[in-house]
């Protein structure tokens, strides 16, 4: 509504501008203004009053256009931001349901790019399209109709200009279209290399391979730079082309229009109408330019949308049963049984573990010993269904784990990863990890994990800050805090 009214008002404005010019060109009595009284006398005179009234109407229209622009921008931003927020939430929820197979398929760096850069691209496009897709067609069609009404023969100049501009814009559009997908893939690669370099910074320094890592980043950087320069250089023709077409159109209208004014009796064209025709021609060309910009943005937005939909449309391999079993924690014994379990990774030729059978009895400790790559970690990852067994079954208290609800299964497991993973926040936050645990429970968990001593050596004890990834504590301390978190669960 705001956009439609704004478009109509902007189309009305040139009419009043031409009317103001017509009134100003009329012969008037020579008048001097020596004070405010003379100004009011001038305002009330029959010669000058139409000029003041027309100028006043123009001022009111401009104020309304400004108000409507502010309101429309507010709602556009609100809709675009809400869209991006919901999309991020849906993508995050979907990623949470992925098994490690799906995580390996997409890679963490690619998922980060999709949930940040790609959604940001779509947000910007939605914001842009809301502001221009509805307004500019109204402006373009309205300006062309008004130009034809003023003088149909001179409007042919506008038609030729619009067709020429459209051909140029489509040519540029076709040239740069394939490069948008390449840019997004390079963004994934850039995130991957940067993430590897930053997370492995200590290893890089210890091996004195800074130059080697810099060369890897520079290679991706150079590819990105080349594509950005090409796209920027090609798209850079748009605005100069627009300026050229606008200038030539105005020149042609003025040239042919002046000839028509010389024969006013035949054509009925006057200077005000010539100005009006020039104004509407400029508005039509500008509107076409903005409409084309929308279509030029489509490929980049389409690439981002496809990448996001690839995440949202992927069906997780590991699913919950339609009527899952919910076990009560207090009634669970905790017996885990593997019956002839075989597992191989997605797209792998060989199985990592084959025909494994054992029973981990409740209340007893079961340990796995084997060489590197023998499948110890893989076997453990099958219990919380980070992966699903290719063959055989795994049971908890004689119930197959694929029959259990995810909430029930996860509530039974205290998981401590090989590499201690901590989150930004305090030590207390990391041990409690979303649970409303009291101080005594948190401290008891830390004590059992043999982490109480080093925690209490910190100035703020349990309120000490942990940086992202736990980089401000040692590897052993991270492991103790991870164990405490699992115990507290």
For each feature predicted by the language model, list its residue ranges.
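Transmembrane helices of ABC transporter permease
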Residues: 1-7, 58-65, 128-183, 254-269
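Alpha-helical segments in transporter systems
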Residues: 1-19, 54, 58, 73-77, ...
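Transmembrane helix-loop-helix hairpins at lipid-water interfaces of multipass membrane proteins
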Residues: 1-68, 148-153, 262-271
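Juxtamembrane helix-loop junctions of ABC transporter transmembrane domains
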Residues: 9-25, 52, 57-108, 112, ...
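Helix-loop junctions and hydrophobic alpha-helical segments within the transmembrane domains
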Residues: 91, 95, 204, 308, ...
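An intracellular "coupling" helix at the cytosolic face of ABC transporter transmembrane type-1 domains
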Residues: 97-101, 117-126, 130, 134, ...
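Helix-loop-helix
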Residues: 146-160, 173, 230-307, 311-312
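ABC-type nucleotide-binding domain
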Residues: 329-489
């Amino acid at each position: 509504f705001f956009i439609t009214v704004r478009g109509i008002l902007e189309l009305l404005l040139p009419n009043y501008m031409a009317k103001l010019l017509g009134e100003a060109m009329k012969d008037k009595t020579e008048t001097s203004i020596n004070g405010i009284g003379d100004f009011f006398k001038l305002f009330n005179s029959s010669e000058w009053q139409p000029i003041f009234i027309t100028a006043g109407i123009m001022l009111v229209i401009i104020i309304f256009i400004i108000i409507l622009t502010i309101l429309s921008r507010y709602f556009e931003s609100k809709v675009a931001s809400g869209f991006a927020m919901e999309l991020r939430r849906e993508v995050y929820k979907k990623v949470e349901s992925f098994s490690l197979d799906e995580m390996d398929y997409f890679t963490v760096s690619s998922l980060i790019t999709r949930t940040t850069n790609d959604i940001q691209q779509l947000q910007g496009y939605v914001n842009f399209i809301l502001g221009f897709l509805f307004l500019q067609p109204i402006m373009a069609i309205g300006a062309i109709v008004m130009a034809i009404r003023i003088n149909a023969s001179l409007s042919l100049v506008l038609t030729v200009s619009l067709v020429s501009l459209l051909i140029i814009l489509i040519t540029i559009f076709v040239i740069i279209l394939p490069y948008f997908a390449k840019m997004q893939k390079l963004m994934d690669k850039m995130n991957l290399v940067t993430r590897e370099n930053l997370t492995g910074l200590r290893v890089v320094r210890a091996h004195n391979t800074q130059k080697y890592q810099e060369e890897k980043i520079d290679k991706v950087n150079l590819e990105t730079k080349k594509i950005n320069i090409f796209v920027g250089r090609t798209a850079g023709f748009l605005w100069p082309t627009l300026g050229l077409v606008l200038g030539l159109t105005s020149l042609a209208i003025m040239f042919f229009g002046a000839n028509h004014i010389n024969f006013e009796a035949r054509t009925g064209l006057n200077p005000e109408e010539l100005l009006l025709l020039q104004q509407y021609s400029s508005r039509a060309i500008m509107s076409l330019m903005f409409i084309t910009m929308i279509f030029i943005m489509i490929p980049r937005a389409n690439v981002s949308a496809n990448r996001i939909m690839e995440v949202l449309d992927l069906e997780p391999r590991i699913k919950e049963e339609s009527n899952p079993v919910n076990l009560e924690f207090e009634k669970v014994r905790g017996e885990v049984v593997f019956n002839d379990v075989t597992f191989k990774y997605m797209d792998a030729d060989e199985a990592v573990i084959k025909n494994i059978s054992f029973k981990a009895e409740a209340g007893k400790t079961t340990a796995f010993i084997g060489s590197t790559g023998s499948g110890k970690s893989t076997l453990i990852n099958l219990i919380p269904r980070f992966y699903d067994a290719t063959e055989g079954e795994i049971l908890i208290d004689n119930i197959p784990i694929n029959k259990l609800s995810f909430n029930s299964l996860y509530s039974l497991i205290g998981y401590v990863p090989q590499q201690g993973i901590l989150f930004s926040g305090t030590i207390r936050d990391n041990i409690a990890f979303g649970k409303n645990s009291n101080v005594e429970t948190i401290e008891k968990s830390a004590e059992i994990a043999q982490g109480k001593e080093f925690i209490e050596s910190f100035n703020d004890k349990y309120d000490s800050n942990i940086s992202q990834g736990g980089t401000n504590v040692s590897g052993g301390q991270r492991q103790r805090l991870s164990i405490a978190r699992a115990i507290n669960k």
